[in-house]
Amino acid sequence: MPIERNPCVYILASGHYGTLYIGVTSDLMKRLWQHRNGATPGFASRYRVYRLVHFEMFGDMERAIAREKQLKNWQREWKINLINGENPEWRDLAVGLGFAPMAPRGRRNGS
């Protein structure tokens, strides 16, 4: 049975107007699980960027990759305007996809 591919560009944020991470994947649900469970070390886990604030689905991976590159070249202000246009409260859209809400961010020193 062939694996279903759903090319997607997504933006994760550490919080409202926080650090942003832009990625591309063929399986958004799997990739979100990896980010949220620390299964992939790197920028997103280092900066605790787990909240899905924007995503766009594509018919093919080539278009998704082109869009990812475009967004990565945008100024931060443009990215914020894109998010605010569709998700002004910066809600975690992953909750609407079936993920549990993330615990509120605390300080790293435990206080």
Positions of PLM-derived features:
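GIY-YIG nuclease catalytic motif and its immediate N-terminal context
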Residues: M1-P41, S45-R51, F55, E62-K69, ...
